[in-house]
């Protein structure tokens, strides 16, 4: 019985030692990390806030266009990947015009007349979907070409206007301004002299005066009837020239 009692004591002591070792190890390693919750933890919205059928793809910042197929629940048509959201929105409009015509819901109202898209209504199957995708891509490419051509023409006309030769109108220098201002009083004075001389030039006027002084005076009249009356002159002759 002593042997059995000793074995029981040894077993109890060994169990206590193992329990103490496990507790020490758990305390040293710290608490266990919490379990990660299942399911999707982070949702990032990729759809464009304004345009229909447009969403961002990847970190490169490109935009994709994907439209719902009318009359087919859950089916979508992949139109393509584009550099800007506006291009993807135009592609959406082209695809909807090809499938729905005038009743299509568009991102841009002017897409109805700016995009040249042939009408290709979707049949009972999906045979027309590749044609719709091709027509939408071609319409967007043509729209971009027309926009680039218009921008190039505008830039060319602006360059031509900036490099046009200056006008042929004379440019007056400061000296010319002084000369013109100085000549204005002279012209006015000449006009005033012309008015004073009865429309004659000054040199002709003074020449006529000198010529008049050199001419012989006319002979005196034989009678005084033309010069005096009977009471004023008394019949005496008057000499007009000395």
Swiss-Prot record:
Transmembrane domains' residue ranges: none
Residue ranges the UniProt entry marks as DNA-binding: 50-109
GO MF term set: DNA binding; DNA-binding transcription factor activity
Subcellular location(s) of the protein: Nucleus
Record SUPFAM superfamilies: DNA-binding domain
Low complexity composition bias: residue spans: 20-29, 148-184
Keywords assigned: Activator, DNA-binding, Nucleus, Stress response, Transcription, Transcription regulation
PROSITE patterns reported for this sequence: AP2_ERF
SMART domains: AP2
Primary localization class, coarse: nucleus
PANTHER family: DEHYDRATION-RESPONSIVE ELEMENT-BINDING PROTEIN 1D (PTHR31839:SF11)
Protein name: Dehydration-responsive element-binding protein 1J
Originating organism: Oryza sativa subsp. indica (Rice)
């Amino acid at each position: 019985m002593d042997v059995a009692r000793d074995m029981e004591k040894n077993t109890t002591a060994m169990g206590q030692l193992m329990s103490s070792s496990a507790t020490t190890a758990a305390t040293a390693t710290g608490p266990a990390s919490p379990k990660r919750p299942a399911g999707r933890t982070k949702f990032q919205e990729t759809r464009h806030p304004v345009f229909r059928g447009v969403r961002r793809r990847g970190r490169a910042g490109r935009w994709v266009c994907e439209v719902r197929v009318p009359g087919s629940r859950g089916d979508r048509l992949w139109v393509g990947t584009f550099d800007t959201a506006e291009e993807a929105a135009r592609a959406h409009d082209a695809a909807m015009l090809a499938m729905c015509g005038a009743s299509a819901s568009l991102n841009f109202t002017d897409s109805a007349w700016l995009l040249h898209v042939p009408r290709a209504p979707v049949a009972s199957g999906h045979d027309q979907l590749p044609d719709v995708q091709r027509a939408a891509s071609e319409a967007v490419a043509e729209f971009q070409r027309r926009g680039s051509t218009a921008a190039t023409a505008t830039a060319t006309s602006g360059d031509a206007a900036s490099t046009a030769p200056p006008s042929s109108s004379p440019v007056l220098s400061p000296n010319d301004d002084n000369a013109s201002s100085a000549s204005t009083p002279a012209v006015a004075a000449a006009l005033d002299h012309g008015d004073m001389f009865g429309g004659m030039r000054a040199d002709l006027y003074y020449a006529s005066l000198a010529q008049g002084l050199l001419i012989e005076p006319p002979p005196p009249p034989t009678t005084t009837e033309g010069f005096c009356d009977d009471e004023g002159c008394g019949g005496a002759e008057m000499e007009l020239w000395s």
